[in-house]
Amino acid sequence: MISPTSKRFVVVPQGGLGNRMRVIRSAYELARSGYGDVHVAFARNNECYCRFEDVFGEINPPLQNFRIAPAKWIDAPSSIRNLHLPGAVRTLYYDLQLNGFASFHREKIMTLSAHARKVYIATCYEFFDTKLEMSSLFTPSAAVKTAVESATRRFEGRVVGFHIRATDNAPALKQSPYTLFEQTACKE
């Protein structure tokens, strides 16, 4: 078994912003638990067309063994579109690659990575149990704060907001049709 102090995890969050936040929260907990250094490679792509720093400020509280930076070419999950080249190149550097949109859990990751010094994880799922609240870990960037304050300054009284995913997720639309949102709004 390899000492946790010599382990390095590179975590590439996938999916939309909400999924990425859950993955980052798992990565933070992985670092906080002392399993090694954790580097989150945040890619700006069609799934989430923003950089981390465009939306969020610093992660709090900061950890010495945890950082978030823009993804590099080699961090990209393998796909037909990139001819699987990043994955092939990564085999030269990483001892273990956990790819895809499968759900991983703490025990499975610890078992699989027990003899690996460098581990690559690309997922859209939470993979490390945590009780950390999103609001305690993530803070909005100055630009987002300013935009929200500007928009909400005009609100009067009590306001209820809805986020409706209408174009990108057919199963979600089946489970949460517009009529359900309308009924909930009327109850409020």
Protein language model annotation of sequence segments:
Residues 50-188:
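Secretory-pathway luminal glycosyltransferase catalytic domains
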